[in-house]
Amino acid sequence: MASSQEKAKTGVLRNAAALLDEMQLMGETQGAKKVINSELWHACAGPLVCLPQRGSLVYYFPQGHSEQVAATTRKIPNSRIPNYPNLPSQLLCQVHNITLHADKDTDEVYAQMTLQPVNSETDVFPIPTLGAYTKSKHPTEYFCKNLTASDTSTHGGFSVPRRAAEKLFPQLDYSMQPPNQELIVRDLHDNMWTFRHIYRGQPKRHLLTTGWSLFVGAKRLKAGDSVLFIRDEKSQLLLGVRRATRQQTMLSSSVLSTDSMHIGVLAAAAHAASSGSSFTIYYNPRTSPSPFVIPVARYNKATYMQPSVGMRFAMMFETEESSKRRYTGTVVGISDYDPMRWPNSKWRNLQVEWDEHGYGERPERVSIWDIETPENTLVFPSSTLNSKRQCLPGYGVSVPGMEIGSANMSSFPRAQGNPYGSLQHIPAVGSELAIMLLNQSGQTLGSPLSFHQSSYSSIIQNVKQNYIPPLTVSTSACLTKQESLPSDDAQHQFHMANMQNGDLEGSEVQPVIDSISESKLNATSRDPRNTDSYTSRSTSEQNSKGEPRGKTRRSKKGLPHKTVSEKSDLSSAPSWICDNQQVGLESKLVGCDEQVNCGNIEDSSGALTQGNFVGQPHGHQVEQKGVLSPPKVESSKSPDGGKSVNSFPNQGCFSQFIDGLDWMTQPSYYQDSNVIQPAGVSENIFSSSADIPPSMIADTMETFQASCLSDCLPNSIQEFISSPDLNSLTFLSPDMQNLEVQLQHDGSNLPSTSNSFVQMSFSEESASQSANLSGLHMESTHRSINTTSCSQPMSTGGFDAGMYSKLPRLKESQILSLPEIHTNSMGTSACSMDATEYSLDRSAKPMKPPVRTYTKVQKQGSVGRSIDVTGFRNYHELRSAIACMFGLQGKLEHPGSSEWKLVYVDYENDVLLVGDDPWEEFINCVRCIRILSPSEVQQMSENGMHVLNDCIQAA
């Protein structure tokens, strides 16, 4: 019994092997026939046609096949066509064979496919390799031209563009007069045609003369038809023809009626679905409105993303001369195309509305696999985090080789664990309106880039940590957690800070110290003339100490700190140890659960310097996270050794000056309001200016300050702040204004200070410090400041005038000296703010609008130009203007009929084709426009996008 089974099994295998040999023999016999060149067939079929591979799985849509029949016969089937209940709307099949064909009379291309239904994707059959099969491939080098009347005349010739002739035809011998050669080309049917290629005329051009008229007559070509020349992978020169779509003037020669053809298509598919047998279909790519044999992978990818009403999409269409263009639109409905015959069918179940109208017909209903959505491509606008956003001026991402933009919104520090949190401001000039705009833009930001982490935030971190506001009675709830330090320590702190900075010279310094001391002893008293006793005692204690004077030097990273509180985690010490005296403020603590720390700092000489504050009359002391490295200021001679000392008697005052004036608009000031956290550990990145020549420090710092300001402020804010009409005194309290007037009246000769504050050292740890100020939560008011941390800027009223007695004359200098900063939107200002929106204690004059910048237009070999894209209403006007600028009239206005292309770089560094995006979005995100010649277009398609980047860098 077993032997008989083995014999039967062996016989089956022998028969299967014989059958396979016979199939291969048949394939070789079929292969003996001339096979149509796949590249030429695809060139004639169109750039969007892609046939499935043999043996692959596809979905066959009978509904789409019926559309092809209707398009071929130009007749819609009537209601007498029967329904086939057992025929599903889509049929999973395996491709057994594909054969390429071309009509001998018209050269119309079509494909014959043999399909076999399968139950699932696992039910596939092994397909033997037949010699007649060739893989589908598109040509890489081709030229297509729509024939004109002169091209089809019997006595004329065929004009070939110079670039196409030089690329496809053999090189001419220009030593001949005139240069000419004989071309031998083959068509779809392997027929040979001979043309004479000559270079003549005025101006000279490439022409096909002898033999061309014979070809036009034999093919019955008319104006509007297209001719294609390609060079295949074997370097053979091939010739194809495309017929223009014309109205049918005569009845079809087919003996079958339109209804019979529809019935035949549906009946064959229904029989195959029920029996599982193979069936044959014919696909005409030039006639069929849409392909109806879809690869399973393409179908699954499209249906994985569930479509929804309002979804944005794009779809590729073939335009003139075998070019492609992407059109965008919106899904406006989802419903069955033919609910009676094909319920629940995915064929054309999307109702769409196109952004542009005209320039060819586009269907009102499409299938999900025919479109590109934001989820499966990065070219189109998306509603996700990677969406195209309104580009806020000054926050663009740099394009390689183009000096456009210098900062990124992702560099703004945010709360730890909440990188997408909203930004919070510290009260300063224009901060409320700036934050409103930045929050609107920041809501769609992606994850911050590590290499864009701002180093400015590290500097602000150290600057802000120097400042501890005095606590009022309303903050007594938080003072229970704080430790009190002896008053002797406070005096020692005051002494060490003054020893560090040197003695103060001149009688005019004494009233300043008096006013500062008084403001610290009595928060309710604003009179700086009642503190002589305290100042004298402080000065005498300073002189009684025997520690040496002078500045201490430290490395750029500083030395570790010793803390008083176990909770404090101190940062590195700066090069200057400043006095942490503070101006009395009327402040109240909002929801403060953190303990404000004040640490001890041990300098390189071993002397322990305590940074504390003289707080309220009750003597409450607070702890400080770090201290401030003071800026370079004008110096005077100390009476003991002629050493250069700072002009400011109190560096805490200068910290306020930094907070209130020059640093008030830095990116690090915008903090996260969702999570209140204490400042974390930070590495000091200050270096002592004693090691660097003063001139170098001043130049470096002025450049650094200008770059900081240019990074964080839009144009309208900068022009508002830097306006000559906006005087610094308007931001001071009435006491300060009176003090300034008094100083000018007395003729006090006050030394001027440099706007350069610190020597910035880009340490490795600076990138991680930008989120350390997330504990700040301040709200700007006119006379009070609410704070939950150890920072307080001078932005509005509610501060003492004594701290400004040593500042330069504010009327003689502006708050900010900003260079003109161009917006990154290249032609439009995305910042829609007005100076009149600022709520200030003055009547601000209406400001003139910011100077509009222009978009660069570049072309290889030509001088770049600038253009205002907002001055145009649509793409056509823009193309016409650019064409006139570079003498390319007629080459840019119609992208479908020209080999010249216009591309642009947006602020996300994406290179897109001009015309893909809606006009309003284009003018807001364009950074640079580039004109690509046909050779550059071809080179880019071969070598990738780095070719365009190289061109941009070279320009």
Curated annotation (Swiss-Prot):
It comes from Oryza sativa subsp. japonica. This is Auxin response factor 11. InterPro entries: ARF_dom (IPR010525), ARF_plant (IPR044835), AUX/IAA_dom (IPR033389), B3_DNA-bd (IPR003340), DNA-bd_pseudobarrel_sf (IPR015300), PB1-like (IPR053793). PROSITE patterns: B3, PB1. Auxin response factors (ARFs) are transcriptional factors that bind specifically to the DNA sequence 5'-TGTCTC-3' found in the auxin-responsive promoter elements (AuxREs). It is found in: Nucleus. Residues 518-573, 609-646 are annotated as: Disordered. Keywords: Auxin signaling pathway, DNA-binding, Nucleus, Transcription, Transcription regulation. Residues 852-936 form the PB1 domain. Interactions between auxin response factors (ARFs) and Aux/IAA proteins occur through their C-terminal dimerization domains III and IV. Pfam families: ARF_AD, AUX_IAA, B3. Disulfide bonds: none annotated. Residues 551-560 have a biased composition (Basic residues). CDD domains: B3_DNA. Expressed in roots, culms, leaves and young panicles. Residues 143-245 bind DNA. GO terms for cellular component: nucleus. One of its GO terms (biological process) is meristem development. Residues 518-543 have a biased composition (Polar residues). Belongs to the ARF family. Homodimers and heterodimers. GO terms for molecular function: identical protein binding; transcription cis-regulatory region binding. PANTHER family: AUXIN RESPONSE FACTOR 4-RELATED, AUXIN RESPONSE FACTOR 5.
